[in-house]
């Protein structure tokens, strides 16, 4: 084999060169390796490796997410290469000769034509030769491809917006792992749901200064960021940066936490889960899971203790003291400290944080469960001294303020004076079949003539229908009519499935075309079992055509008219389905703005019992990016903040749902006015005061009354959210817990 000889002036070689030494496979060279030289070399490399390990242990949290190559030190690789050479075949050898040359160690290496090199000392006295293994480049080529360096992932910590107690979650982020910013949002949503309650999907990421992050390239390694759900603004709080070592908050540990905090929910509306009214509810707990004991304990505590509730707070200070209210739920009350933080943000003490809380009788509140017991009025104190003899006594003005609040929360029945209130007039007409069904089946006229007759009755022509609708569906009877639209029942020619065709007349909504565009845009985004699906949309100059899912039972208004009132079990099914639909909408930042019985379609069994409810008619729906001020909706179901024109958001849908639940149980709305006059009706709505009059409510439990009272809060800040409806014990079906409410 051809060998190249390289002359050197010195035997001084650094560790990098010695690590690449290998004997020539040629049989002409003696197979001897000076043990002393090898021992010194290996000892030097081991010492260097140990030193590197000590440094890396101090900074271990920066190495958790590195690739296998990036986390290995150079001395380790040198040592591995040297040991690899030592374990080679017997033909591999290194011969080191003596030299009297200088310490410059200068040498030259020419191109390699063979796999080995021979180095001959410059000094004449050196008779031995030095055979060198392949260069470092050739050694790297022998390293398996799995050790090829990859792009280092960024190790980033994410907090929940506004939650100063949540320790955060740390995950590796790279362009290879997340091809888009939306993919990162999806992963963060999943990870946060495993540890805390969040109101919806992660939509925005901020840095710790509140700057919005718009791409993966803006993320920096080792930095912390804040995840915001829906349209939340950045909340500048002191995030819990020192609660847990960074190395412990890894993606692996978060994924092992299989004890989901929302397992007791009837369904997960964010994941389009079906919520059948007849199916048994899932049980809480169900296994230990792989999460930490702390998380499991916190989850168990929340499941057994925390439920949506409004409490009254008395702020410490000069009498008469300020009195305010706070909505507690699973999102702001996962722990005792979280509740104190929520109280602090509401009462705004001059001394800073709330440190001590007492009941109205002066008992100190020390556990999370104390906030969800029989007491609903609490004193909030900071670091100031407490005068137990005077501070826990209420003045007359304070008594009156608390009684006014309790009046809005009253669930006891009162005797109804006068005749029974009536349901309002239906806000849209429902036509009877234009053609008798039996006569229609037996008609001998051509199909197109029947269609033409139906359309002519509405002022339309058969040729106006889009060809893809006319050729795919057969036209049936008119099933509904609104201010701007008419609805037909249609049937697919091939499958025989029934659908609804909504024809919107653009001439009737001049200047309001944006409502049509918003309806179509919103419905294209939606996919939920309790929301009517959009099958097809066709836009023409004069009309907009929407092919929609058809529900056989008609709307809820007609069902109420037929049965007058529903049982609690039937009402529970409907409010679950409506609550799930609203939660799904609100998680996407969409408000319906026109929830009423006419826009709720029901599916009935052969006995007339409600099996399923679906939300329809998104003509007024819109995306909420800020407070809305447009006055719209139906008078009976409109929320106080709409009438006051102070700005409103998602919770107006909860108010409307509360009105509907009230109607389902007794057959009439809580706010009525003589002869349907709007001014007295609006005054009653703004006051927020209503009754549960006997005998219509005498057989209805306190649990559902409590739910209605929380949904019909005039102050939107303390009104239930759509998720709170689903979390309420009555909705879940825990009757025992419902009976413990005290107002």
Swiss-Prot record:
GO molecular function: ATP binding; protein serine kinase activity; protein serine/threonine kinase activity
Top-level lineage group: Eukaryota
Every Protein kinase domain range: 473-731
Pfam families linked to this entry: DCX, Pkinase
Organism the protein comes from: Drosophila simulans
Binding site for ATP: 479-487, 502
The protein, known as: Serine/threonine-protein kinase GD17699
CDD domains: DCX1
Keyword annotations from UniProtKB, A to Z: ATP-binding, Kinase, Nucleotide-binding, Phosphoprotein, Repeat, Serine/threonine-protein kinase, Transferase
The EC number(s) this enzyme carries: 2.7.11.1
Active-site residues from the entry: 594
Coiled coil: none
UniProt-annotated stretches for the region Disordered: 54-78
Keyword Nucleotide-binding tagged: yes
Family: Belongs to the protein kinase superfamily. CAMK Ser/Thr protein kinase family. CaMK subfamily.
Species classification: Eukaryota, Metazoa, Ecdysozoa, Arthropoda, Hexapoda
ATP-binding found in the keyword field: yes
Reactions accelerated catalytically: L-seryl-[protein] + ATP = O-phospho-L-seryl-[protein] + ADP + H(+); L-threonyl-[protein] + ATP = O-phospho-L-threonyl-[protein] + ADP + H(+)
SMART domains associated with the record: DCX, S_TKc
Gene Ontology biological-process annotations: intracellular signal transduction
Domain Doublecortin residue range list: 154-240, 309-392
């Amino acid at each position: 084999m051809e060998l190249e000889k390289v002359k050197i002036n010195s035997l001084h070689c650094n560790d990098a060169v010695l690590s690449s030494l290998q004997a020539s496979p040629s049989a002409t060279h003696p197979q001897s390796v000076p043990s002393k030289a090898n021992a010194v070399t290996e000892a030097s490399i081991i010492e260097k490796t140990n030193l590197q390990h000590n440094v890396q242990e101090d900074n271990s949290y920066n190495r958790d997410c590195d690739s296998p190559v990036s986390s290995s030190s150079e001395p380790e690789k040198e040592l591995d290469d040297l040991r690899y050479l030592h374990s080679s075949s017997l033909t591999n050898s290194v011969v080191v000769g003596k030299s009297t040359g200088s310490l410059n160690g200068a040498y030259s290496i020419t191109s390699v034509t063979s796999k080995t090199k021979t180095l001959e000392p410059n000094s004449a006295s050196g008779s031995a030769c030095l055979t060198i293994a392949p260069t470092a480049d050739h050694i790297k080529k022998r390293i398996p491809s799995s050790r090829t360096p990859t792009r280092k992932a960024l190790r980033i910590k994410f907090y929940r917006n506004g939650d100063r107690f949540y320790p955060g979650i740390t995950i590796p982020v790279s362009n290879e792992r997340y091809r888009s910013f939306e993919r990162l949002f999806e992963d963060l949503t999943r990870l946060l749901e495993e540890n805390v309650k969040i109101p919806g999907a992660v939509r925005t990421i901020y840095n710790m200064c509140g700057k919005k992050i718009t791409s993966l390239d803006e993320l920096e390694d080792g930095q912390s960021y804040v995840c915001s759900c829906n349209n939340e603004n950045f909340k500048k709080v002191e995030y819990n940066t020192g609660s847990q070592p960074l190395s412990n908050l890894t993606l692996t540990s978060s994924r092992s936490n299989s004890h989901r905090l929302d397992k007791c929910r009837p369904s997960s509306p964010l994941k389009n889960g079906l919520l059948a009214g007849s199916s048994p509810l899932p049980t809480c707990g169900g296994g230990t899971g792989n999460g930490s004991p702390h998380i499991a304990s916190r989850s168990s505590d929340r499941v057994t203790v925390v439920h949506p509730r409004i409490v009254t707070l008395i702020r410490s200070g000069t009498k008469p003291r300020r009195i305010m209210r706070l909505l507690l739920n699973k999102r702001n009350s996962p722990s005792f400290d979280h509740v104190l933080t929520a109280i602090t943000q509401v009462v705004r003490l001059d001394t800073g944080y709330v440190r001590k809380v007492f009941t109205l009788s002066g008992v100190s509140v020390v556990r999370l469960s104390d906030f969800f017991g029989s007491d609903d009025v609490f004193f909030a104190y900071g670091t100031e001294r407490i005068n137990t003899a005077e501070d826990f006594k209420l003045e007359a003005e304070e008594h009156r303020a608390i009684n006014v609040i309790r009046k809005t929360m009253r669930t006891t029945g009162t005797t109804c004076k006068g005749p029974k209130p009536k349901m309002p007039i239906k806000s849209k007409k429902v036509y009877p079949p234009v053609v008798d069904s039996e006569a229609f089946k037996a008609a001998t006229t051509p199909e197109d003539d029947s269609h033409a007759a139906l359309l002519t009755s509405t002022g339309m022509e058969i040729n106006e229908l889009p060809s893809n609708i006319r050729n795919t569906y057969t036209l049936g009877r008119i099933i509904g009519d609104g201010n701007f639209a008419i609805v037909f029942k249609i049937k697919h020619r091939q499958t025989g499935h029934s659908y609804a065709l909504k024809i919107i007349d653009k001439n009737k909504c001049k200047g309001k075309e944006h409502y049509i565009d918003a309806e179509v845009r919103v419905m294209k985004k939606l996919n939920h079992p309790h929301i009517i699906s959009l099958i097809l949309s066709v836009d023409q100059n004069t009309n907009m055509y929407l092919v929609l899912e058809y529900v056989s039972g008609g709307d809820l208004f007609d069902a109420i008219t037929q049965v007058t009132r529903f049982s609690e079990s039937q009402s529970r099914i409907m409010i679950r389905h409506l609550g799930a639909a609203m939660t799904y909408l609100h998680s996407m930042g969409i408000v319906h703005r026109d929830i009423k019985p006419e826009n709720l379609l029901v599916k009935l069994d052969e006995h007339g019992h409600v099996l399923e409810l679906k939300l329809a008619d998104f003509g007024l729906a819109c995306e909420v990016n800020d407070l809305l001020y447009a006055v719209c909706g139906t008078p009976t179901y409109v929320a106080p903040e709409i009438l006051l024109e102070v700005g409103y958001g998602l919770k107006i849908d909860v108010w409307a749902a509360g009105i509907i639940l009230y109607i389902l149980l007794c057959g009439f709305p809580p706010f009525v006015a003589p002869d349907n006059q709007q001014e007295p009706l609006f005054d009653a709505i703004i006051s927020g005061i209503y009754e549960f009059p006997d005998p219509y409510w005498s057989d209805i439990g306190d649990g559902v009354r409590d739910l209605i009272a929380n949904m019909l809060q005039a102050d939107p800040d303390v009104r239930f959210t759509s998720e709170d409806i689903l979390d309420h014990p009555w909705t879940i079906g825990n009757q025992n817990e419902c009976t413990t409410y005290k107002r």
